[in-house]
Every structure is written in C-alpha cells, then in structure tokens.
Amino acid sequence: MMLRIFYLLFALALITGCKQVKNESGKDTVPTKDTVQASVKPVAVAQMELKADPEEFIPDGYVLFSGCEGDLNKDGKPDVVLMIKGTEESKWVDHEYRGRLDRNRRGLIILFKRDGGYELIAENDECFSSENEDGGEYYAPELDFYIKNNTLILHYAHGRYGYWKYIFRYQNNDFELIGYFGSYDRGPVVLYITDVNFSTRTCVYKENINADDDEAEEKFKVKTIKFKRKNLIKLSEITDFDELDLALPQDD
C-alpha cells in the first residue's frame, strides 16, 4: 500500500515538473493581466515609408506633368504636390485641325516633407482630363494648382467665360473640399459669382444686375443660403472633376 502511494506521488511530481519546464521555455504560456501581447495587425505599427526624391512616388505608367511646393500641414516644411499624366499609347488621337493629341488623363500625388524624406499622404491618379481635351467652339479650361494659406487650390481658367477654383485642406487624414469659388463672365463683365464655404455650409450667390449696361458699374444682388451636408468631399474619392457634383442649393 505504501509503495503504491509512493509511485502515485512520484508520477504527480513528474507531470508537474514537465509543465514547469515547458513554461520556462516560453511555449504555451498563458499571459498574465500585465502581459503586453504583440498586435495581430502589423500595419498599425508599421513606420511610414519615406523617399528622398518626390518623383520616386510616381507609379509605373505615368510621368511627371508639373508640380508645386508649399506648407500644407502647418509644420513650416515645404510639402510637394505632383501632377502626373498617363502614358498609354491607346489614349492618343488624331484631330482634324490640331494633329496628334495626347488624351491621357492626369492626377495628383501629395507628399508631406518629413525629417529624412517625403511621405505619401494622398494620391488620385486620373481625376483630371487631359490638357488636350476638345473645348468645342472655345478652348478647354486650363488647369493650374498651387498652395496658399496651408490649402491646395485647383484653379480652372476659361478665358472670357471666367474661372472657378476648388479649395482643399488636409483634415481627417485626407484632403477635404472646404471651398469653391466660381466667376461666370462675358468677356470683362462678371455675370454671376458662386462662393461656397463647405466648412460652414454657406453658399453665397451674386448676380450682376447691371450686366447688360455697358456704362454702369457692376452691382450685385446677393443671396446667402445655408445648407446641410453630412460629410465633405474628399480629394481621394473624386473620379472626374469634369463630372463633379457639388450638390449646392438652388438659387431660386
């Protein structure tokens, strides 16, 4: 009887010892409340990718079209905006009067300047039409872009017909449309103005009531409308600026 009890105690001791050795080896250990476990999503802790040359961010199948510099995130460093253009041969066309035209679309790459290089913040490769689009009886609008007051401004000039511009600001991890301004002209005479502040949900319409009087100075009838909008338009989500619907309130 005593011998049987001895063998039983010996077996229990052997099993306990095996468990202790396994725990000390670091395998199959149950973490305590104070144990910090590694994240199962390494992307969340991955460091940002920096590149020394902004043009290194241009994807295959695109070339640099133009660019500008300025501070977009209020850190005092010169950020970079690149306009890129596709290179597909199938997008070239023969025009009756203008000859061979490149109709590849254009897009934007936005980079923040960091210590040690540039970081990709936003990219939209084909949101703009070609600079060689057909403008009908008049030439197509000319697109320019620049940085002012920590915002990115996209400016369309359309000669005697006026101009319009979109104003984007970096917020909520994207560039959101916070403003729009359009001047619709007849030569040197301004006919209508649309001025929108999407941050305050305010739209101001101005109509020149002296538009048909060449001798009179411009005099505008002003109407201000407040509107509702849940979310702001993000630059990364715009597929085509030519088809962009701002969903503005009607000026009845």
Where would I find each of the regions flagged by the language model?
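Acidic, small-residue rich beta-repeat scaffolds with periodic aromatic anchors
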Residues: 19-28, 142-252
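Acidic/hydrophobic-patterned starts of short beta strands in beta-sheet-rich repeat architectures
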Residues: 72-84, 146-156
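Beta-propeller blade repeat segments, especially FG-GAP/WD-type strand-to-loop junctions
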Residues: 91-124, 168-170
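Repeat-based blade/solenoid architectures
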Residues: 58-66, 125-140, 162
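C-terminal motif of bacterial Sec signal peptides marking the signal peptidase cleavage site
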Residues: 15-17
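Surface-exposed loop and turn segments in beta-propeller and other repeat-based domains
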Residues: 52-56, 125-135, 187-202
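Short, low-complexity, disordered segments immediately C-terminal to signal peptides
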Residues: 19-44
